[in-house]
Design a protein with these regions (language model features):
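Short secondary-structure boundary segments
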Residues: 20, 51, 169-171
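Phosphate/ribose-recognition catalytic cores of enzymes acting on nucleotide-derived substrates
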Residues: 124-186
Length: 186
């Protein structure tokens, strides 16, 4: 969540409001979401959505519905066309497929940014430091989708400085017997 907020801030988003998915919201009809949340709570003047955007209970809300309500209640709705990569629509499924393949160049093209993972440095056994090759170990959040196990050229950022490195995603090679998947950067 923090990583997503940071990325949106870097993209120029000034204010980010998150709508918690409560039972009330989950079962709210699209019309009620527009009236209660968009108009009532947020008093929107402009809404931008993708052409395949759906919202409301049973995904019955559509961009056309937003436009219709916008005319009635005085807000503008802009429907953005899908971005394409050749003949294929760029979607979260497409992005996940490329990440799962380890196609980091395609991932970067589709997302407009490099893959990144954030976390707290975990102290290991100090074996890398002992052999004059210190490493940084991160345990990625469980919900973080990671590329396949392998070795990647990376850049690490720490205290306003950047460091080039090589990162192993997978079982930690410097420590025998580890069963968890980690991120170890040299």
């Amino acid at each position: 969540k923090e990583e997503r907020c940071r990325i949106l801030e870097e993209m120029g988003v000034d204010i980010l409001l998150e709508c918690p998915l409560t039972e009330k919201i989950r079962h709210m009809k699209a019309e009620n979401f527009i009236k209660e949340i968009l108009i009532g709570d947020l008093q929107v003047s402009y809404v931008a959505v993708g052409e395949d955007f759906r919202f409301g209970y049973e995904r019955k809300g559509t961009p056309a519905m937003l436009k219709e309500f916008g005319k009635k209640y005085g807000f503008h709705t802009e429907v953005l066309p899908k971005e394409m990569d050749g003949r294929r629509k760029i979607s979260s499924t497409f992005v996940r497929e490329e990440l799962n393949r380890g196609n980091m160049e395609k991932f970067r093209f589709l997302m407009g940014t490099d893959f990144s993972v954030e976390g707290i440095v975990e102290h290991g056994r100090g074996m890398g430091h002992k052999y004059l090759l210190p490493t940084t170990n991160l345990i990625p959040p469980v919900e973080k989708l990671m590329p396949p196990n392998g070795v990647y050229i990376t850049v690490s950022h720490f205290r306003d400085r950047s460091y080039q490195g090589i990162t192993n995603v997978g079982h930690k090679p410097t420590v025998g017997g580890e069963k968890f998947i980690g991120v170890e950067t040299y």
